[in-house]
């Protein structure tokens, strides 16, 4: 994800001693608790697991954003359960 963001001009690194850009996890499992395993890293996902996909960008002095989708893993891929429109408003 860092490479994708960097290719579009949103770099990750340290500025003035603070982390900037995309520096946290991509998402996690959902269940009885809000934050459950698996953490979205290099893991094998299983059919019917429910996960969040929530990349975010943060730049001190500018602001930050995080878009979150809830998805369910299927035998053939995934299905997005979130139905919130994604529209940029400044």
What are these language model-derived features?
Residues 27-90:
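Charged, cofactor-coupling segments
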């Amino acid at each position: 994800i860092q490479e994708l963001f960097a290719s579009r001009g949103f770099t990750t690194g340290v500025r003035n001693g603070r982390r900037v850009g995309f520096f946290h996890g991509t998402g996690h499992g959902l269940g009885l608790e809000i934050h459950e395993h698996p953490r979205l890293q290099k893991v094998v996902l299983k059919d019917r697991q429910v996960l969040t996909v929530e990349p975010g960008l943060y730049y001190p002095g500018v602001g930050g954003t995080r878009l979150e989708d809830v998805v369910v893993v299927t035998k053939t891929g995934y299905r997005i359960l979130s139905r919130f429109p994604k529209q940029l408003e400044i």
